[in-house]
């Protein structure tokens, strides 16, 4: 996982730039599209010499959260639990495999965790000085956290829910009311809700929520929408997979779904799911999400993590790995995959000159980074060649600290339905660690971001404030004549999750590569949850499962290599 640069501006206006993790010179901040950039601004000069808005006392929060839903009896949860038990119950290896895993995002952490559960020794290497990959976060000089993205944990994420249970940290998820709340662009400051009744089973609760909402779709539009979805309901998974070749917009025209359904529903869904608009997104992505949300009673119920992901989610996984003999190393950037004469992996060469060897190797980096690492000798192999179609989508995450508490918000995720913004939340309300009774901190996903990723931080903030003035007409003005900005952070990710455009599905690789002893993990690899945190965790489990299943072959290969003297002593 590569890093970018931290740019800052002091209150006198002097611009400063430095390498964020000490691994890239400033001039290389945007040399390649996979570098993530960070921007930090502090705007109020009167705060010079003291904390910008608050101190951090011992955490005391009156919890408004809802009880954890009963997920344990759902089929998907049980299947995910069965896969977890595969590792715990597998035969203990006579000689544990040493598996080198590159990338400590959720996919790499998951791979290492389940390999350790099976009795093997993972060596997890992270390029940056922070865990989490796409869920990474950083603490500023005031002690406030800012994140790579706005992360939501759904009830329909069975592998993540199992993972929280296995780590005994289920209480770190703050469950919210079972609703979806959309801003009304034509009625500034107003919202429309889809409330899922707790007393009804799926899919009736979802249908009820849609039918009860008369502010976004008319009855004729609802009927035509339902008729358009009938083939998916009847055809099941084969039908869903067959729609991979169509964009959402193309599917709507084919099914006779009114354009207003796109304007009122699908634009918001597309941007929330993949940070792009319906004229680009594969309809398969929408149908998979609808299937998960409608087929499981609590599938669309949302939870926030109670604090920053590196400490509250990633560190418990690291502790688990280390407690079972595994290793996790930060600041360990993969420079090159060195090969043996037969085309298999000899070792991972790090940027500091270190060579890391193992019995098996996993690349759990984002697809764009892995494509830069693919050895020339592998480039014409179909498995690797097909990856060219998989490209990360740009996204920008914006955090704004205001000088007051905003009233026109909820303790929930909100769909902005803005042309520039996707979803947002007042994190001072939704998250325990970020709780503040006096001032709001809005975290917003700025998407689609293709045209904005290279623009200045000032331009992005100005555009964001214009949109917020529509969402908070009585409280926010673009010129800050109402609520004042205390400070803000902008995190740019030029290449985030893979862009789920039509005809990508055949290009997604299995976790087991055609190169003996080499594997892939990441949400772009083949698994049923597409580009998501759930997909990343599941990909790691499937990768670890492939390695455990290949144990005999890998152990024999390692033994022969040692006897022939081809493999050096592990570093």
Swiss-Prot record:
It is found in: Plastid, Chloroplast; Plastid, Chromoplast; Membrane. Pfam families: Amino_oxidase. Its cofactor is FAD. Belongs to the carotenoid/retinoid oxidoreductase family. GO terms for molecular function: FAD binding; phytoene dehydrogenase activity. Pathway: Carotenoid biosynthesis; lycopene biosynthesis. Its main location: plastid. This is 15-cis-phytoene desaturase, chloroplastic/chromoplastic. Homotetramer. The lineage of its organism: Eukaryota, Viridiplantae, Streptophyta, Embryophyta, Tracheophyta. Keywords: Carotenoid biosynthesis, Chloroplast, Chromoplast, FAD, Flavoprotein, Membrane, Oxidoreductase, Plastid, Transit peptide. NCBIfam families: phytoene_desat. GO terms for cellular component: chloroplast; chromoplast; membrane. It is a peripheral membrane protein. Its EC number is 1.3.5.5. It catalyses: 2 a plastoquinone + 15-cis-phytoene = 9,9',15-tri-cis-zeta-carotene + 2 a plastoquinol. It comes from the Eukaryota. FAD binds at residues 107, 126-127, 134, 151-152, 157, 334, 523, 533. SUPFAM superfamilies: FAD/NAD(P)-binding domain (SSF51905). GO terms for biological process: carotene biosynthetic process; carotenoid biosynthetic process; protein homotetramerization. Substrate binds at residues 292, 531. Residues 1-96 form a transit peptide. InterPro entries: Amino_oxidase (IPR002937), FAD/NAD-bd_sf (IPR036188), Phytoene_desaturase (IPR014102), Zeta_carotene_desat/Oxidored (IPR050464).
């Amino acid at each position: 996982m590569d890093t970018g640069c931290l740019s800052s501006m002091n209150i006198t206006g002097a611009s400063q730039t430095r390498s964020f993790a000490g691994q890239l010179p400033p001039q290389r901040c945007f040399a390649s599209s996979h570098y993530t950039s960070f921007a930090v601004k502090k705007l109020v000069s009167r705060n010079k010499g003291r904390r910008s808005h608050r101190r951090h006392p011992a955490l005391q929060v009156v919890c408004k959260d809802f009880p954890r839903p009963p997920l344990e009896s759902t089929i998907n949860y049980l299947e995910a639990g069965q896969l977890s038990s595969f590792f715990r119950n597998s035969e203990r290896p006579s000689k544990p495999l040493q598996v080198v895993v590159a990338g400590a995002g959720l996919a790499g952490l998951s791979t290492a965790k389940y390999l350790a559960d099976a009795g093997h020794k993972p060596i997890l290497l992270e390029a940056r000085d922070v865990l989490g990959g796409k869920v990474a976060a950083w603490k500023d000089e005031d002690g406030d956290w800012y994140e790579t993205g706005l992360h939501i944990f759904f009830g329909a994420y069975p592998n993540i829910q199992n993972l929280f249970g296995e780590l005994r940290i289920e209480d770190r998820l703050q469950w919210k009311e079972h609703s979806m709340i959309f801003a009304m662009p034509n009625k500034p400051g107003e919202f429309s809700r889809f409330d899922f009744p707790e007393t009804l089973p799926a899919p009736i609760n979802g249908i009820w929520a849609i039918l009860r909402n008369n502010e976004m779709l008319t009855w004729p539009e609802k009927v035509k929408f339902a008729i358009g979805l009938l083939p998916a309901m009847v055809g099941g998974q084969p039908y869903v997979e067959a729609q991979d070749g169509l964009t959402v917009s193309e599917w709507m025209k084919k099914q006779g779904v009114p354009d207003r359904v796109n304007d009122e529903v699908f634009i918001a869904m597309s941007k929330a799911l993949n940070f792009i608009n319906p004229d680009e997104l594969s309809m398969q992505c929408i149908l998979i999400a609808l299937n998960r949300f409608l087929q499981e009673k609590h599938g669309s119920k949302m939870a926030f993590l109670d604090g920053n992901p590196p400490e509250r989610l990633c560190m418990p996984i690291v502790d688990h790995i280390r407690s079972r003999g595994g290793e996790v190393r930060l600041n360990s950037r993969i420079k090159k995959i060195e090969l043996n004469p037969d085309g298999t992996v000899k070792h991972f060469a790090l940027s500091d000159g270190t060579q890391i060897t193992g019995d098996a190797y996993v690349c759990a980096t984002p697809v764009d980074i892995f494509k830069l690492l693919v050895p020339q000798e592998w480039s014409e192999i179909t498995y690797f060649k097909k990856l060219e179609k998989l490209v990360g989508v740009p996204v920008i995450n914006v955090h704004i600290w205001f000088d007051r508490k905003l009233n026109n918000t909820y303790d929930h995720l909100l769909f902005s339905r803005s042309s520039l913004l996707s979803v947002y939340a007042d994190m001072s309300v939704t998250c325990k660690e970020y709780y503040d009774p006096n001032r709001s901190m809005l975290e917003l996903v700025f998407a689609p971001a293709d045209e904005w990723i290279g623009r200045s931080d000032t331009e992005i903030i100005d555009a964001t404030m214009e949109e917020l003035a529509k969402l908070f007409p009585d409280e926010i003005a673009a010129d800050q004549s109402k609520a004042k900005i205390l400070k803000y952070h902008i995190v740019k990710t030029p290449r985030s999750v893979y862009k789920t455009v039509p005809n990508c599905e055949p290009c997604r690789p299995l976790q087991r590569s055609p190169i003996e002893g080499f594997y892939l993990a990441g949400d772009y690899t083949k698994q049923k949850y597409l580009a998501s945190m759930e997909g990343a965790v599941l990909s790691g489990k499937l990768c670890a499962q492939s390695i455990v299943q290949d144990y005999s072959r890998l152990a024999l290969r390692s033994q022969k290599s040692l006897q022939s003297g081809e493999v050096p002593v592990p570093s």
